[in-house]
Amino acid sequence: MIRILYMSDLHLEMERWRLAVPGWKGFLSRHNGVPRHPARGPMLTDLPQADVVVLAGDIHVGLRAVVYAEQVSEFLGAPAVLVAGNHEFYHQQIQLLQPALFSAAERTGGKVRYLENTVASFDLPGGRLHVLGCTLWTDFALNGDVVGAMEFASRHMNDYRLIYRVTTRFQPENALMRHERSRAWLHITIARLREEDPEAKIVVVTHHAPARAYLGRRDGNIAPAYASELLPEFRDNPPDAWIHGHTHFRHESVQEGIRVVSAPRGYVSHEGGRALEFCPGLLEV
């Protein structure tokens, strides 16, 4: 059995610095050589031991997401897998930040594996694990009107005001192209790994959701910016599990024979007690 702790949508850019581990616990960690608890984010004490930690996007803006992922890896004693959400790219040039995220993760010496249409493979006591990761974005097709959904998203989603390309703002058309590339890559890579390594476990990690069922409060005209209806096309060659974020809707479910989970914290400033009491999810495969 392989144990994966997972969380998403921590939105640390919206959270002030705080002493995450108060009093004598923080003092002892500093003086006993124990890795310090991250100063921002959810409490990570008293969690079950995990083989891998998954951070499914909207962790922090820019390279700070990698910094936090490394702190989590050190504190929990497990490698961290990170995919970018849309918020990682806010106030950034996406074409420049993407390679910078890969480079920053590589400098952690294996503590953080950043994924974008790439695979992180682990040989663990419970077996071999392949984690396939990408932001995923969306096909804007959820409500049956791709053009209308793209126009609505361009007016109402901060992604298309706050994310930049080298010379222009990021547009829904750019998100759609990235989605199509990631979607094709997932199919090809799952098929290849099933053939080459049939005994291994395969877990997909995306930021955007793979089905309407996981929209939570984000239904209606904005829904196509949050999810695409993908699971039926993976029915014949499914991953063992799919972890996502983006919709701020916590769930554990099975659809089309695929276990789908999400553990978003959300905005501490907006979502109050639920965010403050947040605990990562635990997935066993």
Roles of regions detected by a PLM:
Residues 6-8, 53-58, 81-86, 113-118, ...:
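Active-site neighborhood of phospho(di)ester-bond hydrolases with catalytic His/Asp-centered motifs
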Residues 132-202, 208-213, 217:
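Active-site-proximal loop/helix segment associated with metal-binding centers of metalloenzymes
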Residues 94-115:
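Glycine/small-residue-rich loop that forms an oxyanion/phosphate-binding "nest" at active or ligand-binding sites
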Residues 67-71, 96-100, 220-230:
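Charged helix-capping and loop-helix junction motifs
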Residues 1-5, 119-133, 254-259:
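Beta-strand-turn-beta hairpins that frame and shape the catalytic cleft
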Residues 123-125, 216-240, 248-285:
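Binuclear metal-dependent phosphoesterase catalytic core
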